[in-house]
Amino acid sequence: MKKSFLFTSESVTEGHPDKMADQISDAVLDYIIERDKKARVACETLVSNGFCVIAGELKTSVYAPMQEIARKVVQEIGYTDALYGFDYRSAAVLNGIGEQSPDINQGVDREDGEIGAGDQGLMFGYACKETPSLMPLPIWLSHRLTEGLAKKRKDGTLPFLRPDGKSQVTVRYEDGKPVSIDTIVISTQHSPETQQSHLKDAVIEEIVQKVLPQEYLNDNIRYFVNPTGKFVIGGPQGDAGLTGRKIIVDTYGGSCPHGGGAFSGKDPSKVDRSAAYAARYVAKNLVASGVCDKAIVQVAYAIGVVEPVSILVDTQGTGKVEDSKLTECVKAVFRLTPKGIIESLDLLRPIYRKTAAYGHFGRELNEFSWEKTDKVEAIKDFCGIK
């Protein structure tokens, strides 16, 4: 008898308040790192009804025009009219940025040229064979839906849509493999005059049917489109948004553990971000090499210390070689010191705004160097697999 279960993941659009905050924080990071590669950035953003607060710590010689950066992000997301609940022109932008503590900095910038970890912590990476990008199917589908909401709003196909929105996809698995979609939930902000029946039909026809792979669609899918009724008040007018509040959306949709550290607004000396990217890089290359069908990779660091304090590979029983050997392989093939990660993934680039919506992983963009599978042959050689 086949073992059957349901698994659910969610995504949010770029106009969700938490994602607005993430994008502003990463836009600040991009502005600074483009001009000062030695900068240390920890930028946190709050958006609420009619205002935005940018706070955190910097160590840089660059002046960053915070108001201009924040307003440009909000404009590009689509909050261009007060009727949407937030307007890039009239929103107040408050700057509470301070200087990085020298106590932290002394452990990061070392005299020997190495970089100490910016904090202690544990990070996870994951890969599996459920999608071509080696991501879990539920989160991959959820991101495609929220991307679809934004695309159809911006290109005018569904002009009644507004920037705020969410998706959630429940997938049925049999014997550990995805076989069909069970439930789709979409909540999207819309114009006041929009009829709910029209909105539901349009979202299913223009987004679900055109975005999701036909192999997973069936006549028995349960659809919940704006299940509470109208969704006119949205964005920061409806809910406050904060940087780092969507860490499961940002990663694997709950398919693997999470160390708890957020990404956005942090320069790559912060291992919360860079080591999580490296762990994905490791996991994806392990699965792509064929040595396993799934890989969870954990790395952990101590503040100011160069080498990781632990590295773990868990293939959940799918490995063709022992997990302990794969752990040794990772140590031999990959550079997992903060400096090694930054150099091997070329992380001192203004690439981070793009990561701040629709997932940091599983998107084949040129900027996303951690999605490369250029270590496959080295892994095969180490493991003796042809």
From Swiss-Prot:
Q: Where in the cell is it found?
A: Cytoplasm
State the SUPFAM superfamilies in the record. Answer: S-adenosylmethionine synthetase (SSF55973)
User: Where is region (Flexible loop) located?
Assistant: 100-110
Q: Which GO terms describe its cellular component?
A: cytoplasm
Give the superkingdom in one word: Bacteria
Q: Which GO terms describe its biological process?
A: one-carbon metabolic process; S-adenosylmethionine biosynthetic process
Q: Where does L-methionine bind?
A: E57, Q100, D239, K270
Q: Which Gene3D superfamilies match?
A: 3.30.300.10
Indicate the family of this protein. Belongs to the AdoMet synthase family.
For this entry, the protein name equals S-adenosylmethionine synthase
**Source organism:** Helicobacter hepaticus (strain ATCC 51449 / 3B1)
